[in-house]
Regions:
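A short, N-terminal "cap"/entry segment at the start of jelly-roll beta-barrel domains
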Residues: 1-47, 52-54
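Short histidine-centered beta-strand/loop micro-motifs
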Residues: 32-34, 51-58, 75, 81-82, ...
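A short hydrophobic beta-strand segment most commonly corresponding to one strand
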Residues: 43, 88-90, 103-118
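Short, conserved beta-strand element in jelly-roll/cupin
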Residues: 56-73
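A generic "binding-loop/recognition-motif" signal
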Residues: 59, 95, 103-104
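Residue-level recognition of conserved beta-strand positions in structured domain cores
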Residues: 67, 75-77, 101, 109-111
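Short acidic-glycine-tyrosine-enriched beta hairpin
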Residues: 77-94
Length: 118
């Protein structure tokens, strides 16, 4: 049922793809959510969860927007803590990163373009 509109719940829709609700990894049956232009993730992270290994050789631009909680993002250019609703970090291609949820956290991640990491 491919179509050019969709209404849903990001938490539910993202369960199949680790929180990602829009991106190239969705099939034609997902309609407008299948995109090679942008990826959107609803990220729910318990306190202490993180990515210890650095993400390197990134080819996309990334926006990380804090909905709730406290979230540390370590970039190759510095470390930042998102702690107030609406705080965000934005970085371009070539910036390495890793992260940790310092409290139970909800973030929205937007990356563009949507490309395979392989």
């Amino acid at each position: 049922m491919a179509q050019d509109w969709h209404v849903g719940n990001a938490h539910e829709d993202g369960q199949q793809h680790r929180g990602w609700v829009i991106g190239h990894f969705l099939g034609d049956a997902d309609g407008v959510r299948a995109s090679r232009d942008v990826e959107v993730k609803w990220g729910v992270h318990p306190a202490g969860e993180g990515r210890e290994e650095w993400v390197t050789d990134e080819k996309r631009t990334t926006l990380l927007l804090l909905v709730s909680g406290r979230f540390r993002i370590d970039l190759s250019v510095g470390s930042f803590v998102l702690e107030n609703e609406g705080d965000y970090a934005l970085w371009g291609p070539g910036i390495d990163h890793h992260w940790q949820a310092e409290k139970d956290t909800v973030v929205i991640t937007v990356r563009w373009p949507s490309v395979s990491e392989a």
